[in-house]
């Protein structure tokens, strides 16, 4: 029995699932930290902070940077720095700086993962409505989808500012299913992190976990999605479609 035979729509996470956004996110985080005269983190570290929205990203960045600064000063025999600005206010300032810098680098620092466009096109051609659910701040979402030429595939897009409760809360997924006019159990959700899988389970949606994204350094199988794939086009055969690589070879 095909686990996905009752699927009537598919929704996707964005960062780490459809796009590699780490270069742009890391650049904006580091520019914001540098502007506040704090240590910069680097892409490898920032990747472990991605997934819960920009506010949480800023909190994680600031916590790390303040600790790193204290460690560096102690190593150099310098006294600790007394922060005149409370941490909450620093997070607010950091977020404002991040938004400015990310607006400048988002498009050039974001790339489609392999087979994404072909997979979305094949699903749309089959007549399945497609949705997008991301914790990314809403103002950045539409311009990014347009720049990557994938906005045309989605009938429903939910950004991080469009709901009160972000993933892993089920609300964004339930909203997408409602707008698609289908039951949650008829909507497949595809993501790369535990937030995605937890949201899908809470909403009652079947889930696909992808192995290549951003998941806080842990394996996606620990979140127990219904199915695990190494490439996004691996979900096509499960939905009754030819694998996109096979389709490409037929077209050559």
Swiss-Prot record:
Cofactor dependence is on: Mg(2+); chloride
Q: Which residues form the active site?
A: 13 (nucleophile)
* GO molecular function, a single term: phosphoglycolate phosphatase activity
Q: Which GO terms describe its biological process?
A: carbohydrate metabolic process; DNA repair; glycolate biosynthetic process
Q: Which UniProt keywords are given for this protein, alphabetically ordered? A: Carbohydrate metabolism, Chloride, Hydrolase, Magnesium, Metal-binding
Query: What is one GO cellular-component annotation here?
Result: cytosol
Return the Pfam families for the record: Hydrolase
Catalysed reaction(s) here are: 2-phosphoglycolate + H2O = glycolate + phosphate
Give the Gene3D superfamilies listed for this entry.
Answer: HAD superfamily/HAD-like (3.40.50.1000), Putative phosphatase, domain 2 (1.10.150.240)
Q: Which InterPro entries match?
A: HAD-like_hydrolase_sf, HAD-like_sf, HAD-SF_hydro_IA, HAD_sf, PGP-like_dom2, PGPase_prok
| Metabolic or biological pathway | Organic acid metabolism; glycolate biosynthesis; glycolate from 2-phosphoglycolate: step 1/1
**Enzyme Commission code:** 3.1.3.18
Superkingdom as given in the UniProt entry: Bacteria
Residue positions binding Mg(2+): 13, 15, 192
Q: Which family does it belong to?
A: Belongs to the HAD-like hydrolase superfamily. CbbY/CbbZ/Gph/YieH family.
Whom does it interact with, and what assembly results?
A: Monomer.
Give the protein's function. Specifically catalyzes the dephosphorylation of 2-phosphoglycolate. Is involved in the dissimilation of the intracellular 2-phosphoglycolate formed during the DNA repair of 3'-phosphoglycolate ends, a major class of DNA lesions induced by oxidative stress.
NCBIfam families (alphabetical) = HAD-SF-IA-v1, HAD-SF-IA-v3, PGP_bact, PRK13222.1-1, PRK13222.1-2, PRK13222.1-4
Q: What is the designated name of this protein? A: Phosphoglycolate phosphatase
Organism of origin is: Shigella flexneri
């Amino acid at each position: 029995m095909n686990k996905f035979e009752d699927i009537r729509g598919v929704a996707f996470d964005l960062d780490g699932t459809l796009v590699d956004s780490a270069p742009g996110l890391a650049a904006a985080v580091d520019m914001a930290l540098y502007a506040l005269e704090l240590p910069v983190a680097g892409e490898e570290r920032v990747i472990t902070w991605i997934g819960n929205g920009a506010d949480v990203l800023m909190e994680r960045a600031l916590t790390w940077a303040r600790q790193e600064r204290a460690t560096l000063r102690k190593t150099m025999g310098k006294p600790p720095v007394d922060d005149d600005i409370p941490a909450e206010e620093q997070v607010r300032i950091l977020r404002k700086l991040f938004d400015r810098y990310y607006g400048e680098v988002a498009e050039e620092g974001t790339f489609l993962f392999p087979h994404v466009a072909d997979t979305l096109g094949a699903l749309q051609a089959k007549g399945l409505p497609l949705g997008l659910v991301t914790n990314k701040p809403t103002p950045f979402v539409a311009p990014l989808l347009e720049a990557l030429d994938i906005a045309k595939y989605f009938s429903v897009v939910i950004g991080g500012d469009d709901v009160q409760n972000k993933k892993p809360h089920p609300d964004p997924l339930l909203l997408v299913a409602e707008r698609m006019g289908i039951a949650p159990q008829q909507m497949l959700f595809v993501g790369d992190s535990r937030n995605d899988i937890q949201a899908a389970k809470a909403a009652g949606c079947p889930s696909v976990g992808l192995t290549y994204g951003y998941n806080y350094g842990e394996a996606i199988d620990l979140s127990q999605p219904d199915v695990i794939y190494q490439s996004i086009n691996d979900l096509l055969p499960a939905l009754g479609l030819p694998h996109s690589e096979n389709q490409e070879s037929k077209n050559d």
